């Protein structure tokens, strides 16, 4: 058998923080990319001390190290899309902005991670938040804030669908090309997509599950993968929402806090690949005896 001529899948880059429980951050991004038949590479912008119960502390990667990570990847592999998550501080946000300017990537999805959902720890300093709003928004194809992040970036108090739409429009006014305001923390599982021309309200079944750790990271990564695979924006967002909904439904508990999503629910019940089968015991050759010396 030879694999020399297998086609290379789309190569996607995540720039984010590392979660040791692997429910959120880079681990969630890479699992999502793989589940969408893409190959993921990663630049670690921060290490976090956390579990599903919350973030205890963060350790931001020095800007020079993050720049070196990005340069090493860009010099070696053809990155077609970038997903941005936790950056930690303004210095790292500036490194990412410079990298995007040099890279000319087809798709950039910005998940403006500011605070941890569990525990509320700060994941981006105040100067970084301002830089994100002033500089990174306009470098992204899609921005995916949750309610709290949209409120922080726009100053709009969001209590209903109309306020979600207003926040999405304001973020586009500030430079984003398209915005998805995630309503997962509201009473109904409704998201709002604004592409600069029209508003699309995305309804969905609210899954009764506590296993939602990393759902925001997963959603942004799924959008990235769908865009990189050639889907138009509206279809990419709808497919990403459907994927996350099912992954939450199939999620499982691993510890004392909210469990992770099942990023690979699609393959758990698939038949084995063609050509793979069980070999009867009598058809196997006995192990060779070691050679005497």
Go through the PLM ranges and name each one:
Residues 18, 84-85, 121, 182, ...:
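Glycine- and other small-residue-rich loops at beta-strand/loop junctions that grip anionic moieties
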Residues 37-41, 199-200, 226-240:
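Phosphate-handling active-site elements
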Residues 3-14, 26, 30-122, 267-270, ...:
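Conserved N-terminal subdomain of the carbohydrate kinase-like
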Residues 9, 57-60, 234-293:
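Charged C-terminal helix
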Residues 15-21, 199-213:
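Short pre-catalytic strand/loop immediately N-terminal to key active-site residues, enriched for Gly-Thr
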Residues 3-9, 25, 187-202:
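Acidic-glycine-rich active-site phosphate/pyrophosphate-binding loop
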Residues 32, 151-152, 209-233:
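Short, small-residue alpha-helix embedded
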Residues 124-199:
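Conserved phosphate/ATP/ADP-binding segment of small-molecule kinases
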């Amino acid at each position: 058998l030879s694999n020399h001529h297998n086609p290379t899948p789309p190569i996607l880059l995540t720039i984010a923080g590392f979660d040791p429980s692997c429910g959120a951050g880079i681990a969630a991004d890479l699992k999502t990319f793989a589940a969408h038949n893409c190959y993921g590479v990663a630049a670690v912008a921060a290490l976090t001390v956390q579990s599903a119960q919350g973030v205890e502390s963060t350790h931001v990667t020095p800007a020079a190290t993050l720049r070196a990570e990005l340069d090493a990847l860009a010099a070696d592999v053809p990155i077609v899309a970038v997903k941005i998550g936790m950056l930690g501080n303004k210095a790292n946000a500036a490194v990412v902005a410079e990298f995007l300017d040099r890279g000319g990537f087809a798709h950039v999805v910005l998940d403006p991670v500011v605070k941890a959902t569990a525990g509320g720890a700060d994941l981006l300093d105040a100067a970084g938040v301002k830089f994100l709003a002033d500089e990174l928004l306009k470098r992204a194809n899609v921005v995916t804030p949750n309610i709290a992040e949209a409120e922080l970036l726009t100053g709009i108090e969001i209590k209903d669908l109309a306020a979600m739409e207003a926040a999405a429009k304001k973020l586009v006014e500030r430079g984003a090309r398209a915005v998805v305001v995630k309503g997962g923390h509201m009473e109904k599982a409704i998201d709002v997509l604004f592409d600069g021309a029209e508003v699309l309200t995305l309804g969905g079944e609210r899954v009764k599950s506590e296993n939602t750790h990393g759902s925001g990271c997963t959603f942004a990564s799924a959008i990235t993968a769908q865009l990189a695979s050639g889907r138009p924006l509206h279809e990419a967002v709808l497919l990403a929402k459907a994927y996350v909904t099912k992954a939450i439904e199939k999620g499982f508990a691993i510890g004392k806090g909210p469990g992770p999503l099942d990023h690979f629910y699609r393959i758990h019940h698939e038949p084995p690949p063609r050509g793979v089968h069980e070999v009867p015991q009598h058809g196997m050759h006995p192990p060779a005896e070691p050679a005497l010396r």
